């Protein structure tokens, strides 16, 4: 059995019998006025972060969600897109689609604003999405793409890029790991399906996104996720895994390379009211300005004693410039 078939088997079982500990996160779940999440739906939250960010979800967007789980984030997305088939959920596991549909029936009873027709569930493969080109405003996946090996990951990202409209957004949450993993971990199909041994370094993850054409990336969160230790896993060293939330924007690739926002800021504290680098960045006196890493590097090369560049927080929340 290949790793993709093992993954289907793991999530078939998780659909039939909810596994609260599977790929879960301790991140608080978004609470919105008038939104009630059914208990079973919450138990089937097989993610490692959140892909639901209100600032992405304006003007009744068309939303695609790949890997439906229990439907919790689909329900949250539909809160912002209250239209027939405003949200499309795609999954390759029949049992997960059936469980998700049952959860929506319960959600309809608990939420007066929600109608099942707001969400269209489709059987489909992340590697060949049943979605038209340039038809989606916001695409999302939560703790799925880390399972893919490199060739499949590249194909899945290409598919997301294909279906997004110009300036559309791909919002993702996945485990990452800066330490190398041995072959016993990498080749363990079940550990990969459980979102543990497929984790790659953050910079590699970001490069996969820019290689398929995304011109702007935002690192919105980075948190502790899991430990792989020698008592429980086939490893001689303790391996630390984090989860990351990233938004990739389908805008044109700048001539000087992608704009990647990791939470850096510049602060000018000189004698003048402002500092202008004559490249589109004006820093007011003692006011932080969010900047991309490319701009941070360029400003640092000026070697000014009245200019401070903060380290990456990996919690970028919008604004600023590149």
Question: What name fits each language-model region?
Answer:
Residues 24-62, 76-80:
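Conserved alpha-helix/loop element of class I SAM-dependent methyltransferases that forms part
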Residues 154-169:
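A short glycine-rich, Lys/Arg-flanked "PGG" loop and its adjoining helix->strand segment in the class I
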Residues 212, 218-224, 229-322:
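C-terminal lobe and adjacent flexible extensions of AdoMet/dcAdoMet transferase-like proteins
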Residues 59-128:
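Class I SAM-dependent methyltransferase SAM/SAH-binding core
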Residues 137-152:
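A short SAM/SAH-binding and catalytic strip from SAM-dependent methyltransferases
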Residues 176-196:
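Short, glycine-/aromatic-enriched active-site segment of Class I SAM-dependent methyltransferases
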Residues 197-213, 219:
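Short alpha-helix
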Residues 127-139:
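A short acidic, Gly/Pro-enriched loop at the edge of an enzyme's catalytic core
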């Amino acid at each position: 059995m290949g790793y993709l078939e093992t993954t289907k088997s793991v999530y078939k079982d998780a659909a039939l019998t909810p596994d609260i500990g599977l790929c879960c996160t301790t991140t608080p779940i978004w609470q919105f006025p008038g939104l009630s999440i059914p208990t079973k739906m919450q138990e089937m939250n097989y993610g490692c972060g959140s892909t639901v960010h209100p600032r992405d979800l304006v003007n009744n967007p068309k939303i695609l969600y790949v890997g439906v789980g229990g439907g919790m984030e689909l329900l949250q997305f539909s809160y912002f897109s209250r239209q027939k088939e405003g949200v499309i959920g795609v999954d390759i596991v029949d049992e997960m689609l059936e469980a998700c549909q049952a959860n929506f029936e319960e959600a309809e009873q608990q939420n007066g604003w929600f109608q099942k027709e707001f969400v269209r569930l489709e059987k489909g493969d992340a590697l060949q999405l049943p979605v038209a080109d340039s038809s989606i405003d916001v695409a999302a996946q939560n703790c799925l793409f880390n399972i893919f090996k490199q060739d499949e990951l590249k194909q899945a990202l290409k598919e997301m890029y294909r279906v997004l409209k110009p300036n559309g957004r791909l919002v993702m949450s996945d485990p990452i790991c800066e330490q190398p993993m041995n072959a016993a971990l990498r080749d363990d199909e079940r550990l990969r399906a459980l979102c543990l041994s497929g984790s790659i370094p953050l910079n590699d993850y970001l490069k996969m996104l820019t290689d398929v054409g995304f011109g702007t990336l935002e690192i919105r969160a980075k948190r502790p996720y899991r430990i792989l230790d020698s008592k429980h896993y086939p490893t001689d060293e303790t391996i630390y895994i984090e989860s990351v939330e990233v938004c990739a924007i389908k805008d044109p690739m700048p001539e000087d390379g992608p704009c990647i926002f990791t939470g850096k800021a510049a602060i000018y504290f000189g004698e003048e009211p402002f500092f202008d680098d004559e490249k589109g960045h004006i820093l007011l006196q003692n006011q932080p300005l969010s900047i991309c890493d490319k701009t941070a590097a360029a400003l640092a090369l000026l070697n000014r004693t009245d200019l401070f560049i903060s380290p990456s927080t990996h919690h970028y929340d919008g604004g600023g410039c590149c």
